[in-house]
Regions:
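Alpha-helical membrane insertion/targeting regions
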Residues: 1-185
Length: 185
């Protein structure tokens, strides 16, 4: 969230870095929507709040649209990518995960409409894992830079992908643990 706020400030404050409206508006939408999704979504993992059905339902009615706006604006930014050619692969990785996030949010809505609460929780966990991958990417970049030095464009692509994959893997572990129930023995 802090990174998004700083990026939004950078885009709006510096006339030299003025982006065309085709990019500036989606960046603003993405940062605001993703911030809402990540902050409000964190509270959905609290059993005490999740068990308060009216709160959980109202929060979900904000989270789903925020998540879809975040995912679709990220997809838009990847499709209309206007950065250096060597960064195109990184944009395509982001596109894949933006589309995946939108898809899992749709699956979460379908699951809750069927009153399949376990599937809904699993799909929302996957969406949240993708959404908060920026933090994991920052950690991976920092560890890489401290260990091996600066990252080139090719390395950036792999590190961005690593952040998404790490979060997705952890989400699947949490989902399996949740559905497996307590271990006997």
């Amino acid at each position: 969230v802090l990174g998004g706020v700083l990026r939004l400030r950078e885009v709006t404050a510096d006339p030299a870095s003025a982006l065309p409206l085709a990019s500036a508006a989606p960046i603003g939408v993405h940062i605001v929507a993703m911030s809402v999704f990540c902050c409000l979504g964190a509270f959905q993992f609290s059993p005490a709040l999740r068990n308060r059905r009216s709160w959980h339902r109202r929060a979900g009615r904000v989270l789903i649209p925020a998540g879809l706006f975040a995912a679709l604006s990220a997809a838009w930014l990847a499709v209309v990518f206007s950065g250096p050619t060597e960064e195109l692969a990184s944009a395509m990785v982001r596109l894949v995960f933006a589309v995946a996030m939108a898809g899992v949010l749709v699956q979460a809505v379908i699951a809750i409409k069927r009153r399949d609460f376990a599937a809904h929780a699993a799909w929302m966990t996957r969406a949240y894992a993708i959404a908060v991958s920026g933090g994991t990417q920052a950690l991976v970049f920092t560890l890489w830079t401290l260990t091996f030095g600066e990252v080139d464009a090719s390395g950036e692509t792999w590190l961005v992908a690593a952040g998404f994959v790490i979060n997705s893997f952890v989400a699947e572990l949490l989902i399996r643990r949740r559905t497996a129930g307590p271990m006997n023995g």
